[in-house]
């Protein structure tokens, strides 16, 4: 039994609140256990200069934590005057993952801005951001469809992400909280589509190694969790699902 009473391959409690904010075209508050992230999607009727004239759209992301998302207050990056390497890595990861399932030609020359703001962190903030951002993005696309600016919702598949790891005395576990993540021998983030295709796998041994058999076990656990997350995304999206499938 894990520190929070879960089974080894059991997700934390997940809740996706749709249309959480008033102004964005799409928004959600995603709760993954005690990790909470507000994800919003904004549609801009233009593309970056390097995309002009190509007839395709673009998806990009920004990620941030409020100062007391963590146990000890962290200084806002805006106060420091620069974005940290960790934040830049996560922003690129979110944008890259979402672009993998967006039909950029069907989107047209528009930019989707994804903003992920962590209001409480207890492990898995980047994976929660990706899972929530996908729903926010689809909600924004539904607005485009209703306005007859696109002929279909421009996504090719579902997308979700979770963490897996190897924790001493537990073995392979799914969806690590901060207490588990901080002592894990192996930590891995996995992003997959609804068709079971991998978008990205980030795995690291923390002063430890892992075998091919353990890698397979980690990926099996992640796949199980991601398919459950996609079912929750579908439930949150409701009737919009009929425009995707």
Swiss-Prot record:
CDD domains: RNase_PH_bact. It catalyses: tRNA(n+1) + phosphate = tRNA(n) + a ribonucleoside 5'-diphosphate. GO terms for molecular function: 3'-5'-RNA exonuclease activity; tRNA binding; tRNA nucleotidyltransferase activity. Phosphate binds at residues 86, 124-126. Its EC number is 2.7.7.56. The keyword Cell membrane does not apply. GO terms for biological process: rRNA catabolic process; rRNA processing; tRNA processing. It holds the Pfam family RNase_PH. The keyword tRNA-binding applies. Keywords: Nucleotidyltransferase, RNA-binding, rRNA processing, Transferase, tRNA processing, tRNA-binding. It is an enzyme of class 2 (transferase). Phosphorolytic 3'-5' exoribonuclease that plays an important role in tRNA 3'-end maturation. Removes nucleotide residues following the 3'-CCA terminus of tRNAs; can also add nucleotides to the ends of RNA molecules by using nucleoside diphosphates as substrates, but this may not be physiologically important. Probably plays a role in initiation of 16S rRNA degradation (leading to ribosome degradation) during starvation. Homohexameric ring arranged as a trimer of dimers. Belongs to the RNase PH family. HAMAP family: RNase_PH. NCBIfam families: RNasePH. This is Ribonuclease PH. The lineage of its organism: Bacteria, Bacillati, Bacillota, Bacilli, Bacillales.
């Amino acid at each position: 039994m894990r520190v929070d009473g879960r089974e080894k391959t059991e997700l934390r409690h997940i809740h996706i609140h749709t249309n959480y904010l008033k102004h964005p075209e799409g928004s959600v508050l995603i709760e993954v256990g005690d990790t909470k992230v507000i994800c919003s999607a904004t549609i801009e009727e233009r593309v970056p200069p390097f995309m002009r004239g190509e007839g395709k759209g673009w998806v990009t992301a920004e990620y941030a934590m409020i100062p007391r998302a963590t146990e000890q207050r962290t200084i806002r990056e805006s106060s420091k005057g620069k974005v940290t390497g960790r934040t830049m890595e996560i922003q690129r990861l979110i944008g890259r993952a979402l672009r993998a399932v967006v039909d950029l030609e069907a989107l047209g020359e528009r930019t989707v801005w994804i903003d992920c703001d962590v209001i409480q962190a207890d492990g898995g903030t980047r994976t929660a951001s990706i899972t929530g951002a996908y729903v926010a993005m689809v909600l924004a696309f539904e607005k485009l469809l209703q306005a007859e600016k696109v002929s279909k919702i421009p996504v090719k598949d579902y997308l979700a992400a979770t963490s897996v790891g190897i924790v001493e005395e537990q073995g392979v576990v799914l969806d690590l909280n901060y207490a588990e993540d901080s002592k894990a021998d192996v930590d891995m983030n996995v992003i997959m589509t609804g068709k079971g295709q991998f978008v990205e796998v980030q795995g690291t041994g923390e002063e430890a190694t892992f075998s091919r058999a353990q890698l397979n076990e980690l990926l099996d656990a992640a796949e199980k969790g991601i398919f459950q997350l996609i079912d929750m995304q579908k439930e949150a999206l409701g009737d919009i699902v009929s425009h995707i499938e």
